């Protein structure tokens, strides 16, 4: 390519000469107005422009913030402070001509290179044409040789071979050049397309920016308030720029997907439909086909769920719901340690006021009986005593009839039962109950006849009565030990302890003293400042402070432990009662407690048990509702007394609720709508007000704030410390709520003589009193031909146009009967009076 002058080059790329010389100077080439520009210099200039090209911002924005506060008066009269922040933006647009000039220079240089490439292509075309002409000449020359006479055969062959070789070489060259030419053309086309696209995109973006800038300028005319909303415009434009096309990769399944469904012992219809990825109404319709009616939220059995899933073409895997529980039990390191002798667990049972707690006080050298309210034991207690011959654990049970469940619980966890019988009172109902509990539990019994130091005592009578109830003493050839004791003086108590230890030796009581502990909850309560406190009896292993335990529906890490003497301990072995702190809630008395390695597993099992308990309660309530639908329709007149019961311990609340339910009769039903452990709270008050219930507290006190609220509502709260008081209070409520029964008594007889009609009163019967008296507002029974016609109230009684309250026999009167005008002459009217009967509970 020939050298070009700077003037012609500047005209070609459309840039002033001065600026072009400056660009060359920046690139390191000194040029004047007269100098020429070579191809190499052009390349250097182009590379410099490409390397030093910087995208400058099109707009320069200056943001200004002004903050202020406004005092606004509200409806209440108080002033409100509102913070205001005004944001102003000012834009300075760069000269667009400068930005475009750089691009024009670049584009012009690219065009020159494109021209150069086109010239090169033209050259190659000429070269191809020349090669074609050469080939044609060679072919013509060959034809001439063939036409001429053959002089020398050898020369002719050589010339032919040479010609063939030349033709092949030329053909290969032509093919190679043609391919090269095609590739160059394609590349040029692609480059052109890409450049055109970029130019178009830049042009569109510029137009958009110019439009936005114009809008902002126009908004400035309306003042600074409009600038507050400019941020939103900028955000919207940015969002529009970032829009990208999304393509989903989901393919609709052509075949039915067969799933493997895990089904537990119970599953709801909604859960089953989710597992099968089917709409729940389809599952319900399939169940209807099988003749099973159910709703979406209803829980179905494992067998029904399996049949439905298999019918819908899915595989079923049956699992046990208590699989995790079984795994926890397996993980316990049982049978790894040696069995050693343990202390016997002795439960003391008997009738009320027969001296059970007094006996324990003498053994333990304490005064528990004096501190007990009402002089009776109302909660189960566990203590261990160190004697000269060994340790004995005693469980004290209440003797009242209401505490049957506590006695059953005591008989289940015990090794020996000591039945205390008062020598002056003989065998009573709870004594018989204790004997029956011992027989059911198959536990050996020791009879302790107490109060032998009294003058009225008769131990022989007690011994004879025991035979009637199947207890055969050693004196009469049986195997039951009988001892005469006095809890006050201590007479015979040492012999009783010896008898207990002897019986323990015969039983050969053994347990593991190491490993993961397990036991039973004797009692649980809620204490202020401590939270849930549980009294447990360890039966196996060793319990340490910090162990994770699972107890029924509750779990937790043991924070602290204390023995029956209120001393803090770090660990405890078998047959020793202990109080523990740290459970998540109050466990149910009688629940099994086990040590678990992982807290996560303990929590999972506890949640599963809670859900199972909730489901079972819902099922029971549903059955009760269905069974009582028709009975409630017939017995709509039956009254309900709703009670909210709160007690200090779980066992006490259970016993009291059972005792109160037994007070229900034909007219009144006792409903324990809620029973819990702990003080009376605001939620209890809210529940009682909504259900019109009585709040009963046993050994608990309500908050004073709640009492103030209840006074205004008129809510009834009764706090007692003795079970007798609660029973008497509820009995009184039943007596007051009972419907009074009346007996109808005939006090007078009338005979209708004449009928008068008045527009206001209706039919007036003119009668004569044959017997007795007639009273106003009394009931009139109308008989016609000795058959009943109507019975209603007398609303008006007159004698000679005067209103009177009563009329005696032998006199005439006029009466008006309520809602009855079909009175006829010679009708007989009986006057009735209601007589109240005595109430009975």
UniProtKB/Swiss-Prot annotation:
Residues 375-379 are annotated as: G2. GTP binds at residues 350-357, 396-400, 450-453. Residues 396-399 are annotated as: G3. It comes from the Bacteria. The keyword Nucleus does not apply. InterPro entries: DNA-bd_dom_put_sf, EF-G-like_DII, IF2_assoc_dom_bac, IF2_II, IF2_N, P-loop_NTPase, Small_GTP-bd, T_Tr_GTP-bd_dom. GO terms for molecular function: GTP binding; GTPase activity; translation initiation factor activity. Residues 341-508 form the tr-type G domain. One of its GO terms (cellular component) is cytosol. Keywords: Cytoplasm, GTP-binding, Initiation factor, Nucleotide-binding, Protein biosynthesis. Residues 486-488 are annotated as: G5. Its main location: cytoplasm. Residues 450-453 are annotated as: G4. Residues 350-357 are annotated as: G1. It is found in: Cytoplasm. NCBIfam families: IF-2, small_GTP. Belongs to the TRAFAC class translation factor GTPase superfamily. Classic translation factor GTPase family. IF-2 subfamily. One of the essential components for the initiation of protein synthesis. Protects formylmethionyl-tRNA from spontaneous hydrolysis and promotes its binding to the 30S ribosomal subunits. Also involved in the hydrolysis of GTP during the formation of the 70S ribosomal complex. This is Translation initiation factor IF-2.
